[in-house]
Each structure stands twice: as structure tokens, then as C-alpha cells.
């Protein structure tokens, strides 16, 4: 479980690497489609958080994770920080909201961690097949890590994957055009 805790911590660097990889393309259509799919993913994901507010099982049934917390120290520390911030937000409902940090907000449905990696699978499969295999594994590990650490229920990950597929497809609807063959790093299409 400790290695999944550490894996989950690599999520942000993996996202930044993929942003850099696809936005460095000389194909303007690819860059626009990729970034538009990310806008859809994050934008729709945030609206789904508002429409379907949910906390992960770590917050709903914290006693399950008490004995397990030592095995996932990074997640446990973040659980506590996010929960403290959430309590400040709840206290702000009765007056002025003070000391709330929106970066430390809690939302579970859908899992945007799983969704982002799934979106990278779709883009890599089309344009950089060797990287796709890495992100298939990354999506699986992130999904598994989200369950083990208590951040998400399984349905949150499934919803994230569906959101990734929808975001990918919407990018093609709104940015029409033909792919340049030279942008594909894989030999099979």
C-alpha cells in the first residue's frame, strides 16, 4: 500500500509532462484539440463536483482507515489537511468564511486524477502509442490508489474515465480538421 501512496504523489508531475509533450507539437490542430479536451475535462469535472457533491470513503467512514493510516503516510497527511480546510468551509456557512483555501477543497465524483490519466491514454494511443501503454498502467494504478487511500469510490473512477472519453470526443467535435500524419509517433494507426 505504501508504494501506491507514493505513486499517487506522482500524479501532478505526470500531468505536467503530458501537457508539455502535447503542447510542444508542431501540429496546431493537435495542440488545440488536446488543450480543448483538457478544458472540457476540468471544466465539466468541476461542474460535476457541484452537481454531485460527494466526499470519499476516508471522510465518510474514517474509522476504516485509522489502522491503515501508517501505511499511507502521504495520503494520511493530506486527508487531515483537507479535512481541516473542509471544517473551516463548513464553519463559514454561519458567517464570514475565513482562512479557507480553495486549493484544499474536497470532491470525489468524478475522479479527475483517473480522468486525466485516461485522457492521456486516448491522446497517446492516437499520437504516441508507446506512451499510451505507460498511461494505461498509470490509469490503472491511479484508480487502484484512489481506492486504497480512500479518496474515491470505484464509481468515481468509472465516471472519470467516461468524462475523459466525452472530453476527448468533444475536442474533435469543436476542432474539426484532418490529422497530420507526421504528428503520429507510432507506426500503426
Indicate where each model-derived feature is located.
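Interfacial segments of alpha-helical transmembrane regions
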Residues: 16-53, 58-69
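Membrane-interfacial catalytic/cofactor-binding modules of polytopic membrane enzymes
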Residues: 51-126
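Conserved small/polar residues in nucleotide/adenosyl-binding loops
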Residues: 179-188
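Aromatic-anchored segments of alpha-helical transmembrane domains
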Residues: 42-50, 139-148
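Membrane-interfacial alpha-helical segments at the cytosolic side of multi-pass membrane proteins
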Residues: 17-24, 114-132, 162-171
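Interfacial helix-loop-helix junctions of multi-pass membrane proteins
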Residues: 56-57, 108, 141-167
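N-terminal transmembrane-helix/juxtamembrane module of multi-pass inner/ER membrane proteins
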Residues: 1-17
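Divalent metal-coordination and catalytic microenvironments
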Residues: 12, 34, 53, 113, ...
